[in-house]
């Protein structure tokens, strides 16, 4: 049995020996075995003559210009043809990109603790299966131990990191001490200095710094040809609630006028996953490690083992500070070859655990991969640089010393085909999914339909977002092909079941809104379709396992379809640009019902009516003087509870009245909607709800569908919201403000649930109403005038108040003074 080290030895070798005792630290270390790295002397040393540095080619390095750096997704799309064949690449930002790291705040650096894992580096590749491993071996090897360890992204549940006997038997999941960053840095420096210690002929220690090549050669010597045990700590997979992000977020308080370029940037990993054009923006939940970044605090030799990202997503890693990280990447085209090579050389480990690579605890030399014909490439990531990995690209690596990095996933539209392959593979492996792939796929299709419709509408705005979505559509477009492939897959599986058409039923819209629906057999996501039986109303199967659900008669079974095959075929045609199908799907996406009868009626009405253009109405009819008074009048006469818009004391500034189109769609009982109407109003910024910003509300011509309402954040024109309803248009803005507030951890007042779209446009401001009414002296917009003549002003005021369900008190919201 190994003798525990003397207390004096521990004090002598700890990097914190010159600091006063920390009671919390003592509590942390008590949880570990006396022989853990933090308690032991660093006795092992560098063996340069036995270095095993892999000789492989470097992956490409990209240096975007300031202009290219503005849009991360556009830049990734630009470099993809050059970088994807390597599976990995390095991106060096412009020299002006120097985001401050919030982790260096004294309260975080010195006071906030984070958990670590112990990683036994010498067993990452060459180890015996747990069942064959002699129980005494661990103690025996510790006598000549070196120090080193932890692990990389596991995706494991907290239960897998417990100290239960079962967890202890699982390789790579031993919990280490809790450290502050200050403590961890000192410990990491002490370990590295001791390990690479050099002495001159007189026995004096020579100060020197090992190169990346020196460290790399020693690392692979330890992994491939170990002589002693080497353990290190690794603060891996640190969730947002532990240390938080290294980037400042929009809601956080900070000093300096240039901070907005960092808090709002897409290269800020808190913003990246949900950028317009990333399919992950259609995922409602904040999935830790996927949509919410994880931190990694490393020391020399701490490792992240070979793995691919969940759902074969892209990943982006930013190196906040510290010493370099060395990466190795294998392109997705070589993924199967890597798996085959590792199975060949590590047969016992794979026999015991067929899904070994899912555990992220197995390292494997790039030199052996190269010998097996697997393409592998190297990246050295320095502080302030990004590393991008591509779909299904295996990657691994280690740290050269104390450092901190942060990573998150992203899913450009080209990922969809890879994501589909991933969920089919997961189904075969009976592996649970993290995302609903079909929900993301349909979300992308809906967004593309909206973009195509907005671009096709009269005066459609060709903003960056809409044009980007358009580029994925058309015949053989990336998104079109993804929907087409999914349609063909569904058709084939329904046909293979051979069920009667009477068994096909419409899936309820909220089928999976409140709970995850997955196949009882293979865990396949059931957002698009599901098979069920009367005998088990709460259990469902995917179409591949429908016949395995139960032994009941086929007639008792049913198939739920979110969309029929005809509807999905129509969606494909809509994305290809077929106008009739685009109208149908625009109707669905924009939230109104559409039928052939309605279309016929609308066509006949529009074909008979004349468009009367009164020109740009002179807005000097006391509008500038009146519109602020209108707010007071509306608030005093509406009665009832206040909407958000009324509570804010909305001041709508008219910009252009536009001109009238005389058709029944261009008015309703309560307002007239002139084509070209534009107004300005202040409301909470959808990107930063802590401040108020101007929005431009306008009315466009959507052809047969009548007016199309658009609201745009004036300072950020790409932030536009379209709908065929003024009310729903502003509700979209409200929802976005709430979503952003939630993601930034800002409070959401429970009564802040309602907004009056007509009021936000200005269609309830008396002076604006009067000016619009003057455009129709002959009362040709019959529905509006009939209602106005038949009802009293009190009735109209009652309508306004009846649409308001929220009551707000004036004061501050998110720290902003209400107007």
Swiss-Prot record:
Disruption phenotype: Weak late-flowering phenotype. Residues 644-702 form the FYR N-terminal domain. PROSITE patterns: FYRC, FYRN, JMJC, JMJN. Keywords: Chromatin regulator, Dioxygenase, Iron, Metal-binding, Nucleus, Oxidoreductase, Transcription, Transcription regulation, Zinc, Zinc-finger. It comes from the Eukaryota. Its main location: nucleus. Its cofactor is Fe(2+). Residues 8-30 have a biased composition (Basic and acidic residues). Its EC number is 1.14.11.-. Residues 704-788 form the FYR C-terminal domain. GO terms for biological process: photoperiodism, flowering; regulation of DNA-templated transcription. It catalyses: N(6),N(6),N(6)-trimethyl-L-lysyl(4)-[histone H3] + 2-oxoglutarate + O2 = N(6),N(6)-dimethyl-L-lysyl(4)-[histone H3] + formaldehyde + succinate + CO2; N(6),N(6)-dimethyl-L-lysyl(4)-[histone H3] + 2-oxoglutarate + O2 = N(6)-methyl-L-lysyl(4)-[histone H3] + formaldehyde + succinate + CO2. Zn(2+) 1 binds at residues 519, 522, 542, 545. It is found in: Nucleus. GO terms for cellular component: nucleus. Binds 1 Fe(2+) ion per subunit. SUPFAM superfamilies: Clavaminate synthase-like. GO terms for molecular function: dioxygenase activity; histone H3K4 demethylase activity; transcription cis-regulatory region binding; zinc ion binding. Residues 261-427 form the JmjC domain. Residues 1-39, 120-171 are annotated as: Disordered. Fe cation binds at residues 307, 309, 395. A motif (Nuclear localization signal) lies at residues 130-137. Histone demethylase that demethylates 'Lys-4' (H3K4me) of histone H3 with a specific activity for H3K4me3 and H3K4me2. No activity on H3K9me3/2, H3K27me3/2 and H3K36me3/2. Involved in the control of flowering time by demethylating H3K4me3 at the FLC locus and repressing its expression. The repression of FLC level and reduction in H3K4me3 at the FLC locus results in induction of the flowering activator FT, which is a downstream target of FLC. Belongs to the JARID1 histone demethylase family. Plants over-expressing JMJ18 show an early-flowering phenotype. This is Lysine-specific demethylase JMJ18. It comes from Arabidopsis thaliana.
């Amino acid at each position: 049995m190994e003798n525990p080290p003397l207390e004096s030895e521990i004090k002598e070798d700890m990097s914190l020996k010159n600091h006063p005792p920390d009671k919390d630290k003592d509590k942390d270390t008590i949880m570990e075995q006396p022989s853990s790295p933090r308690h032991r002397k660093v006795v092992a040393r560098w063996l340069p003559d036995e270095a095993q540095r892999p000789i492989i080619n470097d992956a490409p390095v990209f240096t975007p210009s300031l202009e290219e750096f503005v849009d991360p997704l556009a830049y990734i799309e630009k470099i993809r043809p050059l970088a994807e064949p390597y599976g990995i690449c390095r991106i060096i930002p412009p020299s002006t990109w120097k985001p401050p790291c919030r982790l260096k705040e004294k309260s975080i650096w010195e006071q906030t603790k984070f958990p670590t894992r112990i990683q036994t580096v010498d067993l990452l590749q060459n180890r015996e299966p747990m069942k064959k491993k002699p129980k005494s071996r661990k103690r025996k090897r510790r006598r000549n131990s070196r120090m080193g360890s932890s692990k990389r992204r596991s995706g494991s549940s907290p239960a897998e990191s417990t100290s239960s006997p079962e967890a202890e038997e699982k390789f790579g999941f031993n919990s280490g001490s809790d450290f502050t960053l200050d403590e961890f840095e000192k410990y990491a420096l002490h370990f590295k200095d001791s390990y690479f210690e050099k002495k001159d002929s007189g026995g004096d220690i020579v100060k020197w710094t090992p190169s990346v090549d020196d460290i790399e050669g020693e690392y692979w010597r330890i992994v491939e040809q170990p002589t002693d045990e080497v353990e290190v700590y690794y603060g891996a997979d640190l969730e947002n609630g532990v240390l938080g992000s290294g980037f400042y977020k929009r809601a956080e308080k900070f000093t300096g006028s240039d901070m907005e370029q960092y808090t709002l940037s897409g290269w800020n990993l808190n913003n990246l996953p949900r950028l317009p054009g990333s399919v992950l923006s259609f995922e409602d939940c904040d999935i830790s490690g996927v949509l919410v970044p994880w931190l990694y605090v490393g020391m020399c030799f701490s490792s992240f083992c070979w793995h691919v990202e969940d759902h074969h997503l892209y990943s982006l890693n930013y190196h906040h500070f510290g010493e370099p990280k060395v990466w190795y990447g294998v392109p997705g085209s070589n993924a199967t070859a890597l798996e085959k090579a590792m199975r060949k050389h590590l047969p016992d480990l794979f026999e015991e655990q067929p899904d070994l690579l899912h555990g992220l605890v197995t390292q494997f030399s790039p030199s052996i991969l190269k010998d097996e014909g697997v393409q592998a490439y190297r990246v050295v990531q320095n502080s302030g640089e990004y590393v991008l990995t591509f779909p299904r690209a295996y990657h691994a690596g280690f740290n050269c010393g104390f450092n901190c990095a942060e990573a998150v996933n992203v899913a450009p539209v080209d990922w969809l085909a890879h994501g589909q392959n991933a969920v089919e593979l997961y189904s075969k492996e009976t592996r649970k999914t993290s995302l609903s792939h079909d929900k993301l796929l349909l979300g992308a299709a809906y967004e593309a339909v909206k973009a195509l419709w907005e671009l096709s509408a009269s005066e459609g705005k060709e903003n960056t977002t809409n044009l980007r979505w358009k580029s994925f559509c058309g015949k053989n477009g990336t998104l079109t092909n993804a929907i087409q492939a999914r349609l063909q897959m569904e058709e084939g599986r329904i046909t293979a079941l051979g069920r009667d058409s009477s068994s096909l039923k419409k899936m309820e819209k909220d089928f999976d809104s409140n709970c995850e629906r997955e196949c009882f057999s293979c865990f396949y996501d059931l957002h698009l379709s599901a098979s069920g039986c009367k005998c088990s109303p709460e259990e469902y199967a995917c179409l591949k396992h429908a016949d395995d659900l139960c032994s009941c008669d086929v007639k008792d079974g049913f198939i739920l379809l979110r969309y029929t095959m005809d509807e999905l075929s129509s969606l494909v045609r809509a994305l290809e640009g077929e106008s009739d199908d685009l109208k149908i799907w625009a109707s669905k996406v924009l939230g109104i019902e559409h039928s052939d009868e309605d279309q016929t009626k609308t066509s006949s009405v529009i074909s008979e009516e004349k468009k009367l253009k009164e020109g740009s109405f002179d807005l000097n009819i006391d509008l500038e003087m009146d519109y602020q008074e209108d707010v007071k009048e509306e608030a005093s006469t509406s009665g009832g509870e206040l909407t958000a818009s009324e509570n804010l004391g909305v001041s709508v500034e008219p910009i252009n009245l536009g001109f009238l189109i005389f058709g029944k769609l261009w008015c309703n009982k309560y307002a007239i909607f002139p084509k070209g109407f534009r107004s300005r109003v202040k409301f909470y910024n959808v990107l930063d709800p802590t401040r108020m910003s101007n929005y431009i509300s306008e009315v466009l011509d959507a052809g047969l569908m009548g007016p199309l309402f658009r609201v745009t954040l004036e300072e950020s024109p790409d932030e536009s919201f379209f709908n065929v309803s003024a009310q729903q248009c502003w509700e979209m803005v409200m929802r976005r403000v709430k979503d952003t507030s939630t993601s930034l951890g800002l409070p959401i007042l429970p009564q802040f649930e309602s907004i009056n779209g007509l009021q936000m446009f200005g269609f309830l401001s008396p002076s604006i109403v009067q000016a619009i009414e003057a455009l129709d002296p002959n009362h040709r917009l019959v529905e509006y005038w009939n209602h106005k003549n038949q009802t009293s002003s009190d009735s109209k005021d009652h309508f306004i108040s009846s649409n308001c369900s929220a009551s707000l008190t004036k004061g501050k919201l998110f720290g902003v003074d209400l107007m």
